[in-house]
């Protein structure tokens, strides 16, 4: 038994909420709040696909991710002012895009592109997992918009998708790390799954001591436990 900084149990998520229709203009818009982490996720739809998909008879989904300058303890420069995106930003937006494309039948989407914009307004660990969880809802809202307009006859959604962080903190596997835990964890892992208990992505790194197979199993089971709860929350938000 350990005392986590947030006083949560090892297998306990931070408080999680989704506010839908958060902004006015996007086809899908969600504010996701995960403890003290807050991310706005917007889904926009345009007709047409990237050049590499021309004549492919399928749609596309892409994602962008960014953090407001004062989303963290001290102000950071906007990446636009530096003239390029950082490696972390590129990695995260690719992860979001891969995760959500796994939820779709892109051929059923047709000649449309969904762009997901994730803007972190307050960061306390887990921004990429929160972004995936909120973006899944925003994407589904955007698909419903196309269905209401009669553009989509068949729903291209195959699965809901959710993500959570797990890690080894003070020698104990824990679920949903906040910043205080993440910055001191011996192992940090992000897990993305579908609502039928299948894995999309597992990213794990040992920061200090290497971890063993039994610890990996414990982390994966913690992630499955957390993702099941997150998907239930997503369903409530979409009902």
UniProtKB/Swiss-Prot annotation:
PANTHER family listed in its UniProt record: EXOSOME COMPLEX COMPONENT, EXOSOME COMPLEX COMPONENT RRP41
InterPro entries associated with the record: ExoRNase_PH_dom1, ExoRNase_PH_dom2, ExoRNase_PH_dom2_sf, PNPase/RNase_PH_dom_sf, Ribosomal_Su5_D2-typ_SF, RNase_PH, RNase_PH_bac-type, RNase_PH_CS
PROSITE patterns: RIBONUCLEASE_PH
Subunit structure: Homohexameric ring arranged as a trimer of dimers.
Annotated source species: Coxiella burnetii (strain RSA 493 / Nine Mile phase I)
Protein name from the UniProt record: Ribonuclease PH
Sites where the protein binds phosphate: 88, 126-128
CDD domains cross-referenced by the UniProt entry: RNase_PH_bact (cd11362)
Domain of life: Bacteria
Nucleotidyltransferase found in the keyword field: yes
The enzyme's E.C. designation: 2.7.7.56
Major enzyme class: transferase
